[in-house]
Amino acid sequence: MIEAAIGRGVYGMIITDHDNVMGGLVGKKAARKYRNFRVIPGAEISSQSGHILAIGIETDVPKRLSVEETVERIHDLGGIAIASHPFSRRVRPSLREECLKTDGIEVFNATNRGLANVQAVSLARTNGRPATAGSDSHWVRTVGKAGIICDDPLNDIRRGQTRLFGTYASLWRMRVFNFRQLASALVNRPIWK
């Protein structure tokens, strides 16, 4: 993934695997061999209401906590908390209100479609919340599709001093990925049990 990012002109990435920091820590270590490339570890925490990006942490945060408690744990670890894709279909509507307890809102997600990103932009602007963007990459071909441009990611996000960029991930590639996820879930956890 690092080589794909470099190939697309990206000079750093925030790696946030679901509910654990391991991928980010491995990526941070792997990035040492590349000059002028930085990996910031984190996790995409599954709170009771939806996903919260924990950026800049190196210790896991338990899942299924309230948004408020999730944010508190992230802050205790020195990280920042971003409401991830608050208007996607996978998120409970309560996150849309609770995301104002976070440090910022992901307003562009390369895998969202329809009004989800537009609604997130409106929520962030209306409430004066810092905005972020992300590829939400689950495979190498979407790395670098969206992100932030800044000098000091953690502090610049906190202050709302980032520029965003983004294009949508290919619908075809997303469908293939989602089909593979579904097939894997059915094999590993059959619905009839």
Go through each PLM region and give its residues:
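Aromatic-lined carbohydrate-recognition surfaces of secreted/lumenal glycan-active proteins
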Residues: I82-R90
